[in-house]
Amino acid sequence: MLPRLATVLLSALGASASVLPTTTTRDLASRAAPVASLCTQYAYLKTNGYEILNNLWGIDTATGGGSQCTYYNGAVGPAVAFSSDWTWRGNDNTVKSYVYANRVFERRLVGDIKSLPTSVQWSYNTTNVRANVAYDIFTHTDVNHPNSSGDFELMIWLQRYGGIWPITESSTGSPVERVTIAGYTWELFTGWNGAMRVYSFLPPSGTSYNSFSADVKLFFDYLGQKYAFPASEQYMLIYNFGTEAFTGGPAHFDVSRFQAEVQV
């Protein structure tokens, strides 16, 4: 992400979705010595069909200091494992980093994509942190638009810490609705980041989805049905998963398995 109640049950967006398998035990890749260490501001690694980025784009707002290193821990079959250690101080309400793994794919119109199956297993050892764990996807009418912004942003938060909030135009901070998609319950927030419309799906307060498997295309389908998202005009630019770090730490974010696919 850039610097920034009606209950609806969609049975049509449920169990029939294409998803990827998950395992019930942590994979060994994230426990071993890292394959690569990424510790500079935009340290980057492309491997196994994924890009790993130590994306410290908000480091200048860390007035109290801090640092972050991200580690590629290896391939787990068709998936990847990565982790990140960080500590940040100063400006509690600004994002210091969004480290992530991004699936490499050929850009296509969202409407031409049949499914976006994904699965992830993650954990967080936290010390007074303000952070989230989230998927982040940008779309734009221009297939060659940079992947750092878009006309639309879809965020799927799996957890949040320290009372942080998504972008919202609600004066009370309330979600616009509660909805069930892909078998999970979400609270939907929406607002603007400059000229970009942002849709953020969050678990209900007190809920954490540490093991998540779903078809992300179902979220776009829902936005098209309910909020007129123009899938036939918008190219998907990026498809990633990671953590936005605000302040706190020392913290250790561990992704033992992340897999994402683009099926057309």
Curated annotation (Swiss-Prot):
Glycosylation sites: N125, N147
Main subcellular location of this protein, as a coarse class: secreted
Temperature dependence (free text): Optimum temperature is 30-40 degrees Celsius.
Source domain of life: Eukaryota
One Pfam family named in its UniProt record: Glyco_hydro_12
Function according to Swiss-Prot or TrEMBL: Endoglucanase that functions in part to hydrolyze 1,3-1,4-beta-glucan during infection and spore formation. Shows preferential hydrolysis of barley beta-glucan and lichenan, but also hydrolyzes carboxymethylcellulose (CMC) to a slight extent.
SUPFAM superfamilies in the cross-refs: Concanavalin A-like lectins/glucanases (SSF49899)
Signal peptide: 1-17
InterPro entries given in the database record: ConA-like_dom_sf (IPR013320), GH11/12 (IPR013319), GH12 (IPR002594)
The protein, known as: Endoglucanase cel12B
